[in-house]
Amino acid sequence: NSAAASDVYKRQPDNAFVQNEVSNVDATIGKEFMLKSIVALVAACVLILLYVAYRFRRIGGLKAGSTAIVALLHDMLVVFGVFVILRIPLNGNFIAALLTILGYSINDTVVIYDRIRENTGLYGKKMSLPELVNLSINQSFGRSMMTSITTCIALAIVCVVSIIFKLDSIFTFAVPLLFGMVSGVYSTMCIATQLWVSYKTRKAAPAPK
């Protein structure tokens, strides 16, 4: 804290100390931080659910939104895991990284859902649902990968620069974000769409006699 820093300055006046960052951690701040974090994330997820459910009501609506939220929860767990494994403090960078990944991942999901909706009108009666979804993913794969690779390269450069110049605050934001970006591509193609297909297929299956 500031009192401890002042004491060090007085005891060693000949040394040029630089105070880069000050963090206060106590039970009250921890509770307030977690509460605000949970409120922000829940609000973001609810808004995303409503948006996806309304925009893609022709292909499942609420179920499409629910499967997208499951994929987003996966991405948030990945980001949280990176913070825990690297022992990065859960501060403002944590929430910023989570909210950034939410926006990035849902963008990929919306692109593929939009392609599924379009292909449903074109090939809905000519292809099975798994084939239609597979076609939609293949059509969106190139764009998603190019966007992700470009973003990951930029983040990797930021990570290297932050290590060289010892910019801890930037490093603790960029590294979890890098892993979250990769997770977002995976969850969109392998979790959200597959859960949606499973739901639609199970719903369309005849009830056992």
Stretch-by-stretch model annotation:
Residues 55-59, 86-88, 161-166, 200:
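Short helix-capping/hinge motifs at transmembrane helix termini and TM-loop junctions
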